[in-house]
């Protein structure tokens, strides 16, 4: 890993055409590389009611050949959220395309990627997901279970050029966030113990230095380093399999899914406040 302080300041990304930002989550699934296997990926489109009563649409795809699941949604403010569960590599990828406020001098969009370890009880297996069938596509659904908020301190950067060694999905999903891909030391240890090369990861400033940095919302100078905060939610996803009992069967059998909603907050170092202009001090 590179020593702390040697990471380049992310350069301004070229403006993403507005047409791409307006694409449906269904079309965005093609960016993930999901479905690269011989079988066509199974897809569900789900309308979901948020806690504030707004309704969004999610696209979920499963590829049992690649052993992966993807989820795409567009938040009411236009932000595009993508999630990949890569079961082969024990990797979760969260990608956010955040629309900028041009009147505030922000760029048209900013991309972030967060990469963490996938635990196999986080979401149902890809094979089970691939067997789900679309029912009542116009029905508005709510998650049966709200899982606890997960707060993650991202203290390691991922080297985009080597990211394919961590997950083959990373190059496609995080292509717009090459200088803003973050993970955690504890997850790095897990992956390197399983053979992932350490060149994939780059050190960020030490935890003590980060602890002393103010939150970006409290910094006035846009050129100063600070600790950025970003939150996202997966509004509806199949988190568990349901099992039923029958007198005719000696053992429980799979008979459905349980849906969950889960929120995440990520804290991470940025070398300039201008890379975190959405983070307003509460």
Curated annotation (Swiss-Prot):
InterPro entries: Oaf (IPR026315), Oaf_C (IPR053897), OAF_N (IPR053894)
Alphabetic keyword roster: Signal
Ranges in a coiled coil: none
Superkingdom, natural source: Eukaryota
Signal sequence interval, chain numbering: 1-29
One Pfam entry name: OAF_C
Family: Belongs to the OAF family.
Protein name (database record): Out at first protein homolog
